[in-house]
Amino acid sequence: MIQKSQTRRGGFTLVEIMIVVAIIALLAAIAVPNFLRARKRSQATRVLEDLRLIDAAVDQYAIETNRTTGYQVQWDDVKRYLKVGSKLYNSTHADILGGDFGATFSVDTLPAVPTSTYTSLSDVAPAEFWSPFRTP
């Protein structure tokens, strides 16, 4: 008489593996768009902070050199009041997305959000987000 082996082989069935893959795909479909949105929002926050730093640097330059409203401050003058080694200091008056802040800034006038940056981040940062800075 032939005996069947009673030992059962361990492992996962194809159906079990497919269910796990489907669950992982579902979680990824939910998480990835949220991650990308959060990343863009953090980029917008970084640009906003750079605008604040530029405005403060222009004000500091104007105070130390007795400049009045409307005086045009050059990037090299602003740069002296930024933290040495920072990305903004090392840039050629550009934000992290490559948008140009401009080479000159006017005393007592807030700097503007670069047009290309405003356009690329408009889905996560509407006009109110950029207040009080000028938008295109």
Name each region found by the language model.
Residues 56-59, 63-136:
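Extracellular/periplasmic head regions of type IV pilus-like filament subunits
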Residues 1-12:
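N-terminal leader/signal peptides at the extreme start of proteins
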